[in-house]
Amino acid sequence: MESSSRRTFLKGTAASLLLFHSPWALAKKSARSPKVVWVVLRGALDGMHTVIPSFDPMLATHRPSLSKAAKGSTLKLDQGYLLHSALPNLHQWYKNKQLTTVVAVGTGYGSRSHFDGQDYLEWGGENKESGWLARALEMQHSSAIAVAQSTPLSLQGTEKVTSWYPSRLKDSSEDTYRSILSLYDTDPALQTAFKQGIELKMTTTMEGMGKQRGQFVSLAQSCGRLLKGSEGADCGMLELGGWDTHNNQEPRLKRQFAQLDKGLVALKEELGEEWDDTLVIIATEFGRTVRQNGTQGTDHGTASVLLFAGGRLPQGGKVLGEWPGLKENQLYQGRDLKPTSNTFDWISQHLAYHWDTNVNTLNRAVRGA
């Protein structure tokens, strides 16, 4: 996605390698065709306000008001963690072993620029010629669709990708479409591309679409519709901006979480039984500062949280990752939550299990090595 598009999206609020053995090998797998949904939360999600370390006594010291609101959640996870109260559906998935959370993760990006951090998250590192997801899909010979206004960096570098987004234009008549098609008689490639666009439009204008253009719930529902069935894409990508909470964090995140929670439910419902063969990966570019600021918010940080959802998780219903602690000498650069594991390693592990492929080979593809 180009920087200008990304900046526009950010302003809106509405739309080393770890190996696991027995838990991964013993988890039940499906024989059906697997689907993948990659969800990027743009703006730097506060992981500590998402999966809340209520057991850490330093939380209230660093966040006197934010921690009070967050620790009021009754959505309990294991090891003393809490899930934010605005994520009730995800909590039910957790209890059903359809959600995994990973705390204190980082991509390896070393600064705090949204745009560079998002590029790093999508490339799979620095200065890549293709996106990490595009490389992984090429290895699997899979196709993808991005529910975005243009092809995001994650999916650049593969020919088996298209993008779709609700049109600003009013619906046109069939005669209009036929007239446009006739203009492409001498260019079969353009004619085919136009036909595919019309087919996508028809697929996504069925009953149940929300009235508000770009609304995440509607986009997630459309994503599920575009993935469904033998003719659907193998992978979809969604984006949701609005996570840059420098002020009034609690009410803003409450609204954001509600939108995310409802959107993912819409995705699951649209996929139906195919949810059992779906892996949803939810990540952000970096986290927030450990200390709250003077405007009831947080600033750009380092480690955040990573979420996996779906019907075929190897370790569903778990909080994974190592908690680094919140004492002064445990903070990264004296201000941030310290990353204790790498985002791309976790993604590679989950994708390797989901696709039943070699984790080391996949990790090299994801990292562009």
Task: Identify the meaning behind each predicted range.
Residues 2-270, 291, 308-369:
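Feature for exported/extracytoplasmic and membrane-associated proteins, marking the mature portion
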Residues 264, 271-294, 300:
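Metal-dependent active-site segment of extracytoplasmic phospho-/sulfohydrolases and closely related
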Residues 104, 296-297:
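Mature extracellular/periplasmic domains of secretome proteins
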Residues 233-235, 283, 301-304:
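Active-site lining segments that contact anionic ligands and/or coordinate catalytic metals
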